[in-house]
Regions:
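Mid-domain Rossmann-like dinucleotide-binding core that forms the NAD(H)/NADP(H) cofactor-binding site
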Residues: 80-153
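Helix N-cap at the beta1-alpha1 junction of Rossmann-like dinucleotide-binding domains, i.e.
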Residues: 136-139, 169, 192-193
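A short acidic, Gly/Pro-enriched loop at the edge of an enzyme's catalytic core
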Residues: 154-162
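ADP-ribose/adenylate-binding Rossmann-like module
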Residues: 177-195, 209-210
């Protein structure tokens, strides 16, 4: 939504106007078919939709009432409430962590919502606590079981699995400089600008770059 608002959103399949904004939603079941495992009053997570008529939607789903297949929604604890929208971001983090030949990250770029979830899921799944880079002092708080540092204070150059959750497309040279030979960099954010990096350093280290998209139903 920020990129759409600022006009910086690059051409993307499904992008057009009129546009239904928003992504996932949390709501209360008002009506359910007979025999469904959900009942009226249940709180559910609702993924976005591409099923709008005469309108475009980049997974949009912002509406007072939604009609959806029972197989697409996920029942959540009522105590979670509106925070249940984070299920999508958590599933996106899991999707990045379970890619082909994926390894747990030992470095995460960015301590926003996705970066925090990547770090927490890594630890819960049995991985070693990763280092997280963050340049905004306000975002350095809230770490539990892992360390958040400013990249300028990190002298390591032996990271083997780097996950980017910042969406920055202009910093790959810095990340590669902190990598060991054969390291993998996972681009888990969304990038409005072209990805650029100097080839010689990446060539000498034989860096692998993997792109991770949004979550799939299996991740949920």
């Amino acid at each position: 939504e920020k990129l759409l608002w600022s006009g910086a959103m690059p051409p993307f399949p499904g992008l057009g106007y009129p546009l239904v904004p928003g992504y996932e939603a949390v709501g209360e079941i008002l009506e359910a078919p007979k025999g469904a495992y959900l009942k009226v009053g249940d709180l559910v997570f609702v993924p976005g939709s591409n099923g709008f008529v005469d309108a475009k939607g980049l997974f949009g789903g912002s509406a007072r009432h939604l009609v959806t297949s029972v197989n697409r929604v996920t029942k959540i604890n009522s105590e979670i409430g509106e925070k249940g929208v984070l299920y999508a971001l958590a599933a996106t983090a899991r999707h990045a962590l379970t890619g082909p030949d994926a390894k747990f990250p030992d470095l995460i770029i960015g301590h926003g919502a996705l970066g925090r979830l990547l770090a927490r899921i890594t630890i819960i799944a049995g991985g070693k606590p990763p280092t997280v880079w963050e340049i905004d002092e306000k975002r350095t708080v809230g770490a539990s079981g892992y360390e958040v540092v400013h990249p300028y204070d990190d002298i390591r150059n032996d990271y083997s699995s780097v996950f980017d959750a910042s969406g920055r497309s202009d910093l790959l040279d810095d990340w590669i400089g902190h990598c060991a030979a054969g390291a993998e960099i996972v681009l888990a954010g969304f990038y409005a600008d072209r990805i650029n990096f100097a080839f010689p350093q990446a060539f000498m280290k034989e860096i692998k770059i993997r792109i991770s998209a949004e979550w799939k139903q299996a991740d949920m």
